[in-house]
């Protein structure tokens, strides 16, 4: 596993994932477990392959390889301020990530 700012050297991690062009199973944003490719350039979440935009994205840092929708993926913020201050986005925490999310924000 390549160690970078996104992966932190881990194969999987609880992350904030926001679809800038639509939704993720009914919501704009979710917090959940993501997995990383060996190179760390791709993120796998809810049967989606999200490739690093490499500076090509307008609103996101990743894009869906199949639909080309842009995504913003980042680490979970302890203050709970994961969304952009100027946006009103409903965020849901995946059931299997709730325990790890609580651990992160209470560190």
Regions found by a protein language model. Give the residues of each.
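Mixed-charge, low-complexity intrinsically disordered regions
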Residues: 1-33, 42, 47-107
């Amino acid at each position: 596993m390549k160690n970078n700012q996104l992966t932190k050297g881990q194969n999987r991690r609880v992350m904030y994932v926001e679809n800038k062009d639509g939704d993720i199973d009914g919501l704009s944003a979710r917090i959940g477990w993501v997995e990383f490719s060996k190179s760390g350039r791709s993120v796998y979440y809810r049967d989606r392959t999200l490739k690093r935009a490499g500076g090509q994205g307008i609103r996101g840092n990743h894009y869906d390889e199949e639909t080309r929708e842009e995504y913003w993926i980042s680490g979970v913020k302890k203050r709970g301020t994961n969304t952009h201050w100027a946006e009103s986005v409903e965020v849901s925490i995946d059931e299997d990530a709730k325990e790890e999310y609580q651990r992160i924000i209470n560190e």
